């Protein structure tokens, strides 16, 4: 006889894997910086400590993933496929706005089935660096945006610390500080920080390891 509270066959179902996360993107004159933490969890268990949540959509367009890991990656893969075809038809790289619209349309079409929030950011010859939020099928261009479970802890910081006209290095420092603060407070965010800087010259990838993260007074 089963005891009360004893595990049953049904209780061993695999929980959905989530990128309970902190993602961020910032525009600067000539490009963008996109960043994320690296923790992936299923329920209370951490299933991946170093997952890269910055997914390329095209050569100079990336998206930052949050929500269900499978759903977010599915949206990114569908968008990347459509943008590849779009680029072949136009015989030139797609615009960042076009990429954001593709992600927005997919997110809205499957809003009842998929649990994901993507930030789209990149560079093109027409508008330079651009950052778009696509939550729930909306589309908003912003000088910077944040997302994921950790974002609720850093709205005050990013509003106070952001200033127009920052250099690429200042944007990287701003992004690193914000994500570090979120990782300190949000149990679903953690690991390392991935940074991608996108300009006309190309894409620069960086990883900020745990012992390289900035230190704050509350630690």
Swiss-Prot record:
Q: Which residues carry this modification: N6-acetyllysine?
A: 53, 109
GO MF terms held by the record: threonine-type endopeptidase activity
One Gene Ontology cellular component: cytosol
PTM comment for this protein? Autocleaved. The resulting N-terminal Thr residue of the mature subunit is responsible for the nucleophile proteolytic activity.
Q: Which Gene3D superfamilies match?
A: Glutamine Phosphoribosylpyrophosphate, subunit 1, domain 1
Kindly give the InterPro entries that the UniProt entry links to this protein. Ntn_hydrolases_N, Pept_T1A_subB, Proteasome_bsu_CS, Proteasome_sua/b, Proteasome_suB-type
Q: Where is this site: Cleavage?
A: 20-21
Q: Does the keyword Protease apply?
A: yes
The primary site where this protein sits is: cytoplasm
List the SUPFAM superfamilies hit by this protein, alphabetically.
Answer: N-terminal nucleophile aminohydrolases (Ntn hydrolases) (SSF56235)
Q: What up-regulates or down-regulates this gene?
A: Up-regulated by interferon gamma (at protein level). Up-regulated by IRF1. Up-regulated by heat shock treatment. Down-regulated by EGR1 in neuronal cells.
Tissue and organ distribution: Detected in liver (at protein level). Expressed at high levels in the thymus, spleen, lung, heart and liver. Expressed at moderate levels in the kidney.
Q: Which UniProt keywords apply?
A: Acetylation, Cytoplasm, Hydrolase, Immunity, Nucleus, Protease, Proteasome, Threonine protease, Zymogen
- The entry's propeptide annotation covers 1-20
Q: Which reaction does it catalyse?
A: Cleavage of peptide bonds with very broad specificity
Top class in the EC scheme? hydrolase
Biological process (GO) annotations held by this record are: antigen processing and presentation; proteolysis involved in protein catabolic process; response to bacterium
Q: What is its EC number?
A: 3.4.25.1
Q: Which family does it belong to?
A: Belongs to the peptidase T1B family.
- What does the record note on quaternary structure? The 26S proteasome consists of a 20S proteasome core and two 19S regulatory subunits. The 20S proteasome core is composed of 28 subunits that are arranged in four stacked rings, resulting in a barrel-shaped structure. The two end rings are each formed by seven alpha subunits, and the two central rings are each formed by seven beta subunits. The catalytic chamber with the active sites is on the inside of the barrel. Component of the immunoproteasome, where it displaces the equivalent housekeeping subunit PSMB6.
Q: What does this protein do?
A: The proteasome is a multicatalytic proteinase complex which is characterized by its ability to cleave peptides with Arg, Phe, Tyr, Leu, and Glu adjacent to the leaving group at neutral or slightly basic pH. The proteasome has an ATP-dependent proteolytic activity. This subunit is involved in antigen processing to generate class I binding peptides. Contributes to NFKBIA degradation and subsequently NFKB1 generation.
Task: From the Swiss-Prot or TrEMBL record, give the protein name.
Answer: Proteasome subunit beta type-9
Q: Which organism is it from?
A: Mus musculus
């Amino acid at each position: 006889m089963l005891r009360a509270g004893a595990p049953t066959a049904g209780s061993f179902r695999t929980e959905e894997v989530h990128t309970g996360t902190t993602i961020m993107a910032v525009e600067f004159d000539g490009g963008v910086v996109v960043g994320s933490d690296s923790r992936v969890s299923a329920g209370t268990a951490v299933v991946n400590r170093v997952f890269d949540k910055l997914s390329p959509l095209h050569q100079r367009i990336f998206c930052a993933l949050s929500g269900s890991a499978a759903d977010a990656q599915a949206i990114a893969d569908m968008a990347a496929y459509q943008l590849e075809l779009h680029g072949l038809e136009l015989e030139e790289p797609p615009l960042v706005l076009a990429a954001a619209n593709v992600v927005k349309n997919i997110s809205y079409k499957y809003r009842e089935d998929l649990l994901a929030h993507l930030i789209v950011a990149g560079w093109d010859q027409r508008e330079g660096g651009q950052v778009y939020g696509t939550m729930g099928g909306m589309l908003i261009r912003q000088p910077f945006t944040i997302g994921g479970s950790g974002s609720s802890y850093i709205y005050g910081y990013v509003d106070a610390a952001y200033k127009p006209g920052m250099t690429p290095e200042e944007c990287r420092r701003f992004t690193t500080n914000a994500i570090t603060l979120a990782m300190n407070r949000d149990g679903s965010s953690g690991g390392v920080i991935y940074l991608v800087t996108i300009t006309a010259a190309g894409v620069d990838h960086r990883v900020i390891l745990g012992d390289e993260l900035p230190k704050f007074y509350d630690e």
